[in-house]
Amino acid sequence: MLYYLFEYWENKYDLLGAGVFQYISFRAGMAAFVSLLIALVFGKKIITFIQNKQIGESIRDLGLAGQMEKKGTPTMGGLMIILCIIVPTVLFAKLTNVYIVLLLISTIWLGFIGFMDDYIKVFKKNKEGLQGKFKIIGQVSLGLIVGLTLLYNSSVVIREYTLADGSKSTIQSSSVYTDVESSLTTIPFLKNNELDYGSISCLITDNCTPILYVLLVIIVITAVSNGANITDGIDGLAAGTSAIIALTLSIFAYVSGNAIFASYLNIMYIPNSGELVIFGAALMGACIGFLWFNSYPAQVFMGDTGSLALGGVIAVMALAVRKELLLPALCGIFLIENLSVIMQVSYFKYTKKKYGEGRRIFKMSPLHHHYQKSGFHESKIVTRFWIVGILLAILSLATLKLR
């Protein structure tokens, strides 16, 4: 919104300083600042409003240290996160950019699914929340929208350079280029690190690229959003981890959306993707601002309203910058938490069937509860998980050069 206003003032009145809004770095910095400001100024008021509506967390006694003290803590704090994402993005991003539109839709879409889940838990006194099938339907529907848009929208392109022998390359090696719609993505750590989903689909059957790609998008969005949801089990873990991931994806978006940096790093140039930095900055600011109130001891929980939205937009952002195959590393905390639940449940069922009694791999799942049961304090678990998250982020950024 402000981008267009200041562009108009610059063109119409030659307003001094208006041109600064042309710079992605400035708008990203302002988006992060405003996002943090909204959280710090309005956060307490939002928490008070939630408390007045008696929207408190109901706690099931799992025998964890300090667990029952959290009973009644306001939940649905994800509304604060969503507000802190949407307002700065609308103010500072180009609202005609297809990637920004997709991410705003994803934020609201998954936020609504999470809100309905929290609403049923709190007001209908149903601990199961929204039925799993409805969550899946919502995530699959969003996956269809995102997948088809990324595949067929004319603004979603990569730059292909024409070499002297007539061959094509995404690495800048000539001054002759065309921006083309493509299903290319990148594979981390490989020298020739480009993968065309179209070439995989040809091994299965002809003309099945759209089906394969959309299916992948659905899986990625569902897996990452559910991973963030499972990770949100102790104070500050999901918010802090998401902030680290948001910063990393913003860096990927910046270098991929800048022709000079893309050429220097020998990576795929993705026109229009630089605008994702503004959204990523707002996302990071929202997570850090939320941490002000969610760090131990938490004054508010994000609930599914926040966790599903966070995981979903992280997935969509990674798909937009064609780094979805890097997500197992970048979102390693989400992955480990998810796997710990799958392993625990599967092993319990297997041993119960084979030996007549269920056995466990971990003292409790997800993994953060295992460490709680082992006597570690919440703050220590969260801090160490953040450190691992930072290491994974650095490893992910290293793929820009290590291949």
UniProtKB/Swiss-Prot annotation:
GO MF annotations in UniProt: metal ion binding; phospho-N-acetylmuramoyl-pentapeptide-transferase activity; UDP-N-acetylmuramoyl-L-alanyl-D-glutamyl-meso-2,6-diaminopimelyl-D-alanyl-D-alanine:undecaprenyl-phosphate transferase activity
Pathway(s) where this gene product acts: Cell wall biogenesis; peptidoglycan biosynthesis
Domain of life: Bacteria
Keyword Transcription regulation: no
Membrane topology, record value: Multi-pass membrane protein
TM ranges: 30-50, 73-93, 95-115, 136-156, 210-230, 242-262, 273-293, 300-320, 325-345, 380-400
Broad class of enzyme this protein falls into: transferase
InterPro entries referenced in this protein's UniProt entry, alphabetically: Glycosyl_transferase_4 (IPR000715), PNAcMuramoyl-5peptid_Trfase (IPR003524), PNAcMuramoyl-5peptid_Trfase_CS (IPR018480)
Cofactor(s), by name: Mg(2+)
EC number: 2.7.8.13
Principal location: membrane
Cell location: Cell inner membrane
A Pfam family matched in the record: MraY_sig1
Any GO CC annotation of this UniProt entry: plasma membrane
One GO biological process term: cell wall organization
UniProt KW keywords: Cell cycle, Cell division, Cell inner membrane, Cell membrane, Cell shape, Cell wall biogenesis/degradation, Magnesium, Membrane, Metal-binding, Peptidoglycan synthesis, Transferase, Transmembrane, Transmembrane helix
The reaction(s) this protein catalyses: UDP-N-acetyl-alpha-D-muramoyl-L-alanyl-gamma-D-glutamyl-meso-2,6-diaminopimeloyl-D-alanyl-D-alanine + di-trans,octa-cis-undecaprenyl phosphate = di-trans,octa-cis-undecaprenyl diphospho-N-acetyl-alpha-D-muramoyl-L-alanyl-D-glutamyl-meso-2,6-diaminopimeloyl-D-alanyl-D-alanine + UMP
Family assignment from sequence similarity: Belongs to the glycosyltransferase 4 family. MraY subfamily.
PANTHER family recorded: PHOSPHO-N-ACETYLMURAMOYL-PENTAPEPTIDE-TRANSFERASE, PHOSPHO-N-ACETYLMURAMOYL-PENTAPEPTIDE-TRANSFERASE HOMOLOG
Its job: Catalyzes the initial step of the lipid cycle reactions in the biosynthesis of the cell wall peptidoglycan: transfers peptidoglycan precursor phospho-MurNAc-pentapeptide from UDP-MurNAc-pentapeptide onto the lipid carrier undecaprenyl phosphate, yielding undecaprenyl-pyrophosphoryl-MurNAc-pentapeptide, known as lipid I.
Name the record gives this protein: Phospho-N-acetylmuramoyl-pentapeptide-transferase
Species: Cytophaga hutchinsonii (strain ATCC 33406 / DSM 1761 / CIP 103989 / NBRC 15051 / NCIMB 9469 / D465)
